[in-house]
């Protein structure tokens, strides 16, 4: 899936920003979180997050649910490289495994399990 953030900001600018963030906040992970285009779930109010390295994927999902004011009975799925990451995984390990060449971790979310298997 194409990232709107990548389309709107040149590579050099993204890379410099991620490097600056990592230098200033070594214990935080720069994350870009965007909605899967065709999903009917609410659009998030901000795309950029500085996530504590020891946060789990499940805790990050909770943050996203709160930001889009998603009711408890509604499902939300997050994807990293079009794959559902394990809920108990630390964001730091997901970052090390899947960070983009610009230094950001790109996460997409959807109300449907649109990629792969659970």
UniProtKB/Swiss-Prot annotation:
The record marks 116-117 as: Cleavage. The keyword Transport applies. The keyword Transmembrane does not apply. The C-terminal 2 residues are removed by ATG4 to expose Gly-116 at the C-terminus. The C-terminal Gly is then amidated with phosphatidylethanolamine by an activating system similar to that for ubiquitin. GO terms for biological process: autophagosome assembly; autophagosome maturation; cellular response to nitrogen starvation; mitophagy; protein transport. It is found in: Cytoplasmic vesicle, Autophagosome membrane; Vacuole membrane; Preautophagosomal structure membrane. One of its GO terms (cellular component) is fungal-type vacuole membrane. Its main location: membrane. Keywords: Autophagy, Cytoplasmic vesicle, Lipoprotein, Membrane, Protein transport, Transport, Ubl conjugation pathway, Vacuole. One of its GO terms (molecular function) is phosphatidylethanolamine binding. Pfam families: ATG8. Residues 117-118 form a propeptide. PANTHER family: MICROTUBULE-ASSOCIATED PROTEINS 1A/1B LIGHT CHAIN 3-RELATED. Ubiquitin-like modifier involved in autophagosome formation. With atg4, mediates the delivery of the autophagosomes to the vacuole via the microtubule cytoskeleton. Required for selective autophagic degradation of the nucleus (nucleophagy) as well as for mitophagy which contributes to regulate mitochondrial quantity and quality by eliminating the mitochondria to a basal level to fulfill cellular energy requirements and preventing excess ROS production. Participates also in membrane fusion events that take place in the early secretory pathway. This is Autophagy-related protein 8. The gene is atg8.
């Amino acid at each position: 899936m194409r990232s709107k953030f990548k389309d709107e900001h040149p590579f050099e600018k993204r890379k410099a920003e991620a490097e600056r963030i990592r230098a200033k906040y070594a214990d935080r992970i720069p994350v870009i979180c965007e909605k899967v285009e065709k999903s009917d779930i609410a659009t998030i109010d901000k795309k950029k997050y500085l996530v504590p390295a020891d946060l789990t994927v499940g805790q990050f999902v909770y943050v996203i649910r709160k930001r889009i004011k998603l009711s408890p009975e509604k499902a939300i799925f997050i994807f990293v490289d079009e794959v559902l990451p394990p809920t108990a995984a630390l964001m730091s390990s997901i970052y090390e495994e899947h960070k983009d060449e610009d230094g950001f971790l790109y996460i997409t979310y959807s109300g449907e399990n649109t990629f792969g298997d659970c």
